[in-house]
């Protein structure tokens, strides 16, 4: 049977910045040859708010409320790295109780982050049910945050240089344990609903494969890196906070496709529950903030009756000075390595505040993954990367 050959010009398609599966204001200029993706150019910057410049015109205490807006699905990680950098630069110690409370909050945030990835990713694939289920569990996490910090999703403003803003309220620990006991069977329910569904597996298995070498060369981090066979987790590598006190495993896969990234994130939620339970069981007493962290640099030492005498308060002063020096601090957020490069100049303001977001680096590999794929795979591969545009654009 004779076939009629049809040759068409490549079609340029704009996806976003208001497409529901763009996960924010991301615009993709996709060049298509029929159903095949020839090229893809991400256009970013629609959510740029000058967060680095704002940081350089604020003290650390003033800047903490701003940082939840980078990755607004996981604001606690932003706060953690914002206070970790000045702490490392000035050598401010964090009390054991404060460190345990931080770990509990960060792991709750990791679960909330993965849930907010899980629902929309499955909605992109075509499974609507889990999208509504995950809101139920995230609501419980937000209730815990509201009780401890006074706020729910973003702008918790809970982390402080040298500790946390307030101790855990009475009864909070019991509520958190109740959530942990409730949540583990829920993950099993999700897995039963989704993981072995033949339609779901055909949709994501073998799609968007990243080799081990590619993952390292592109500078990927977090689940994107661990799904490609690299067992790298900053909680184990950098030994920050008190993660060494707990028994938990780094979750990783070798396939490097969308299914591997899904599997890593689902397992990480179980590990987070394991860490939270251990942290609550071993929660030490003592202060929740460093009462000796009076100022990062006391400035001029003067006589007690002199005009410029600096009174020493119990908490970190809003006008403390950053010591001269530079530091790179990083934490393992739900999306990967979130880092701050900080240069202090013996001033109340940092001289340079460089944010290294995980999803900005992870997003770079998207055009490489999309070339040669079908147009239906675009939203699947993008969804598996887990990007939040507030963090990408800053």
From Swiss-Prot:
Description of how the protein assembles with itself and partners: NDH-1 can be composed of about 15 different subunits; different subcomplexes with different compositions have been identified which probably have different functions.
Organism lineage: Bacteria, Bacillati, Cyanobacteriota, Cyanophyceae, Nostocales
Record GO cellular component, one term: plasma membrane-derived thylakoid membrane
E.C. code: 7.1.1.-
Family annotation (PANTHER family): NADH DEHYDROGENASE [UBIQUINONE] IRON-SULFUR PROTEIN 2, MITOCHONDRIAL (PTHR11993:SF10), NADH-UBIQUINONE OXIDOREDUCTASE 49 KDA SUBUNIT (PTHR11993)
Role summary: NDH-1 shuttles electrons from an unknown electron donor, via FMN and iron-sulfur (Fe-S) centers, to quinones in the respiratory and/or the photosynthetic chain. The immediate electron acceptor for the enzyme in this species is believed to be plastoquinone. Couples the redox reaction to proton translocation, and thus conserves the redox energy in a proton gradient. Cyanobacterial NDH-1 also plays a role in inorganic carbon-concentration.
HAMAP family on file: NDH1_NuoD
One example of a Gene Ontology biological process annotation: photosynthesis, light reaction
Keywords assigned by UniProt, alphabetized: Membrane, NAD, NADP, Plastoquinone, Quinone, Thylakoid, Translocase, Transport
Class in the EC hierarchy, top level: translocase
Protein name per UniProt: NAD(P)H-quinone oxidoreductase subunit H
Stored Gene3D superfamilies: Cytochrome-c3 Hydrogenase, chain B (1.10.645.10)
Reactions the enzyme catalyzes: a plastoquinone + NADH + (n+1) H(+)(in) = a plastoquinol + NAD(+) + n H(+)(out); a plastoquinone + NADPH + (n+1) H(+)(in) = a plastoquinol + NADP(+) + n H(+)(out)
Keyword NADP: yes
Location relative to the cell: Cellular thylakoid membrane
Gene Ontology molecular functions: NAD binding; oxidoreductase activity, acting on NAD(P)H, quinone or similar compound as acceptor; quinone binding
Organism of origin: Nostoc sp. (strain PCC 7120 / SAG 25.82 / UTEX 2576)
Family assignment from sequence similarity: Belongs to the complex I 49 kDa subunit family.
Membrane topology: Peripheral membrane protein
One of the Pfam families matching this protein, by short name: Complex1_49kDa
